[in-house]
């Protein structure tokens, strides 16, 4: 059931889609505010994500989507409010960032692969230095993660030898190898052409089908409608409307109606 999130009534958002009602909440944002200088980017953002849920966050540029995602992984600190992920208080000044980053994987639009390392070495790097795995174990885990995204045969290739879609899939494998409880995707297909976009979206759809908890900032409306358990529409730093995928066919607010019309 769709809900309209007014600034004074953000608690309306604390509704988990029916298929996920039995699952515990793994991500919780409560009245989160964030400013950059005098520019207030997040204005009382509140929502919850159940374990195994796939949430798509949509909205115009500057609506706060990516900032919300970055705050979840403590890449940005919030001004007020609270964020909890997998039992970790992200807003705690003393939060163990190494523990948080083991629980949360994040993939960006830019691939951030090391050009001097081959694909396998890129995926193994965090396993060796963060998880302290020996080389044999890190290799086994990395190859399994690459197989999960369909790139195990490219283990010996270097980033410059891969297409943009393949590089993005390596970036996803690198995060998956750490066995996170939550995966965050920040407009990961926005720099790819339609053909390469499709191969990345298929990997993400497989992850969602496998029960991975995912938050996805995207402009791929058809994908969001088809795959997401719920869609969150953000507008001017607030959660404005939230509901299942078919809410895109029946938007409640004029703001979402205008956003969808502009996206056509």
Where are these regions (language model features)?
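ABC family nucleotide-binding domain
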Residues: 24-29, 33-244
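Polar/charged alpha-helical tracts
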Residues: 8-12, 18, 136, 158, ...
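ABC-family P-loop ATPase nucleotide-binding domain
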Residues: 1-33
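C-terminal boundary and immediately downstream tail of ABC-type ATPase nucleotide-binding domains
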Residues: 2-4, 10-11, 233-236, 242-264
């Amino acid at each position: 059931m769709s809900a309209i999130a007014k600034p004074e009534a953000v608690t309306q958002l604390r509704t988990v889609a029916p298929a996920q009602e039995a699952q515990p909440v793994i991500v919780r944002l409560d009245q989160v505010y964030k400013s950059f200088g005098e520019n207030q980017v997040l204005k009382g953002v509140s929502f919850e994500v159940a374990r195994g849920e796939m949430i798509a966050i949509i909205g115009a540029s500057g609506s706060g989507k990516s900032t919300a995602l970055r705050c979840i992984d403590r890449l940005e600190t919030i001004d007020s409010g609270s964020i909890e992920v997998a039992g970790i208080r992200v807003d705690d000044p003393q939060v163990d960032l190494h523990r948080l980053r083991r629980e949360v994987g994040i993939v960006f639009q830019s691939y951030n692969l090391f050009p001097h390392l081959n694909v396998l070495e890129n995926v193994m790097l965090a396993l060796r230095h963060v998880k302290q795995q020996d080389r044999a174990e890190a290799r086994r885990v990395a190859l399994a993660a690459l197989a999960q995204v369909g790139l195990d045969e490219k283990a010996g290739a270097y980033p410059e030898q891969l297409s943009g879609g393949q590089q993005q899939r390596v970036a996803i494998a690198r995060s998956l190898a750490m066995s996170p409880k939550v995966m965050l995707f920040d407009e990961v297909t926005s720099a790819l052409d339609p053909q390469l976009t499709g191969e990345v979206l298929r990997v993400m759809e497989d992850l969602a089908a496998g029960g991975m908890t995912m938050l996805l900032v995207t402009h791929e409306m058809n994908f969001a409608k088809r795959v997401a358990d719920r869609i969150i529409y953000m507008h001017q730093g607030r959660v404005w409307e939230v509901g299942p995928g078919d809410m895109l066919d029946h938007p409640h607010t004029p703001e979402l109606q205008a956003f969808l019309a502009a996206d056509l």
